[in-house]
Amino acid sequence: MKENLEIDKGIPNSLLWVLAILAGVSVANLYYNQPLLNMIRVDLDITAFQANFISMITQIGYAAGLFFIVPLGDLLNKKKIVLINFTILILSLVVIGFSKNIWVLFVASFLTGVCSIVPQIFVPIAAQYSIPKNKGRNVGIIISGLLAGILASRVFSGIVGEYLGWRTVFFIAAVFMLISTIVIMFVLPRIDPTFKGNYRGLMKSIISLVVKFPPLLIYSSRAALAFGAFLAMWSTLAFKMQLAPFYASSNIVGLLGICGIIGALSASFIGKYVKQVGVRTFNVIGCFLMFVAWIIFILGENTYGGIISGIILLDVGMQCIQLSNQTSIFEICPNASSRINTVFMTIYFIGGSIGTLLAGIAWKINKWHGVAYASMILIIFSLLITIVERLMSKRH
């Protein structure tokens, strides 16, 4: 499977699907904690806000990893970067499993976030080395694997946490990462860097990309705001489901993650039609679906039908926004794909962290309704960026 890759010459399907699977396995580490937050709160005797902070600091770690580590994909051997990150992940997951102190858990969660950025090294590989007509499709395959990992992580952690304890989830996750490390050693070919220079010059070039290509900031910001509204739901769902009339345990919260499978299945379809339909149209559709989802979350807050319908719409809407924007950014400057993706995903997860923080505050003030109103405001701002961008493009 170790074939040399050349830009725009194509990527073997076997390698593509291995990367998609490993993208799912590695990104899952960001989301294992979400169905377990209430269990962790009880076990460590902490407040709901402190438990919510575990999720937020994991997202902040991911944003930091995106900004400081992913750009190295243009400067160093990508395979070496992946192996180092996987090794640190194994250690941080084990530490989480043994954590008795909230501050140790915070630090280990941050490191887990930092080193879970590997899927964002795989995405540029798919974009850069696929033949032009397959770029959207192949990026969609990686994203589908990533989404499947997110969905499976919540289901897995919810069920395992309920029956074997929340700590066992992270020990098993460490084993998954050990297996992933071995797979990467054997299947990922050497991919030479495209940037000539040092790390300082590389980081400076990231800033210059933002200045040189204004659409990059537009694509990133509107996706980030939507992602904030998306994570607001998942970071507080465990608290919502423990209350009347559900009184649900972590395994039920995890199983609700299956509802997002429609979003995962839609990723490849969306990637295929981004050029034909247009990124703006997908953004409007995505914002509409997410806004309706939160209305359903309010009206049907005490029914499984309302919760499930809301999750499905929220997930599909999020994929419309993320994938259309992320696919489009790689056309801006193909030779800087890792750095372009760094800007997008760093801003994207900053938005997710802000959404998680706002959700924690909103939950404290007005529980589920507070989270809903905060999320709807984020979605409106995301839509406004698309509307303003459309009006400005007409003027020019």
Where do the model's predicted regions map?
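Conserved MFS/SLC helix-loop-helix module at the cytosolic interface between two early adjacent transmembrane helices
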Residues: 64-102
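Helix-to-loop junctions at the C-terminal end of transmembrane segments
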Residues: 66-77, 265-279, 363
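Cytoplasmic helix-loop-helix junction between adjacent transmembrane helices
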Residues: 108-144
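Helix-loop-helix hairpin linking two adjacent transmembrane segments in secondary transporters
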Residues: 141-188
